[in-house]
Amino acid sequence: MKDRGNKNTSKTRPTVKSRRTRKTTKPSTERKKNVTTKTTIRNNRLQNNLSSQTVQTDKPVDSATARAFPQHTSPDIKFNKEKYRNNAIYAHSKLRKISNAVFHQDKEINRFSAFTDKPLADLSFNMPVKTSTTQKKEIVKSTECQRQDPNAVNAFKIFQSYETSPPYSPCSPKNFMSEIYRLFRCYNASIVQIQVYSRNKILINAMQEKLMSIGNMVINVGEQIISESVHHEPVVAIAINQFFRGTVPHTDALRKNAVAPIPVNASKKKLVGICSLMINAPTEKDLLCAAHVCINFAICHPNEITLNIAKLTQPMLLREHITIYNSFNKYIYWDDYGKLLN
């Protein structure tokens, strides 16, 4: 008889899957395939949506969107040129940076307001370049006026000269160039003017000849004339300050007194011996080259030249330079404006 209780038999039975295993294996495999298929479909839809958004449309894409979402923009960004014509150029280009620049400047001025009560020579060497002006009117002492060099041009020479001035002082060439860079970030060259003052006419003529070797220059040279010098009464000084501050009501009589000139003898006018040189240019390139020429003269003759820079209220543009101005700004504000932003 066969021993049925013995489980160890000589014949090996083939392994047979249970009914439960056979039922669950096939559906799990199909479920994995379905999940993979759905994932692939979802990815394809996402790629199709992104590719459809990259198609160029009539609407211009701003620079912020182009930087944050480069996949949403095409390589050749086209802007609406109507936005950048006529007076709208500033509204969509450099004036966008004015608010940040002015806010930063006011912040630095408030930060270093403790230095405004000191004379210019006592300012710290670590003073930022942008805080070249102070919010308080300064008074020049009579003793310093007596020690003033007769060949000096203006009151800045009382405090310091180009040779002894720190690199961040208002008289330094570095501060002059810094102000030019700051203005060019906000405005174009048509409303920026460089002013040069000197008692040496030969030096002014040499600078004029050097500037004439630069293209697109507009130069105005002349000697300063002053009228008869008179002192104002204290009542006049107080009244005009009250008029500007608005501490008194603006009546017709007050306005008339504020704008009424002090009568003097016109025949007592005289030449003071100071030659002034005004420099304008239609483009930033030309005016920057002129600024470097002025800086070189100021470094070689530190005690004979005073440099200044002014922001005009309206553009100074000649008829001969209109085409140059338009062609230069066309590359910045119209055709390649989107590419330059990136």
From Swiss-Prot:
Q: Where is the composition biased (Basic residues)?
A: 14-25
Q: What is this protein called?
A: Protein U84
**Which residues fall in a coiled-coil region?**
none
User: Which family does the entry's similarity section mention?
Assistant: Belongs to the herpesviridae U84 family.
Q: Which organism is it from?
A: Human herpesvirus 6B (strain Z29) (HHV-6 variant B)
> Mind telling me which Pfam families this protein's record contains?
Herpes_IE2_3
Chain residue ranges for the region called Disordered: 1-37
Any S-S bridges, and between which cysteines? Answer: none
The UniProt entry's GO biological process terms, in alphabetical order, are: regulation of DNA-templated transcription
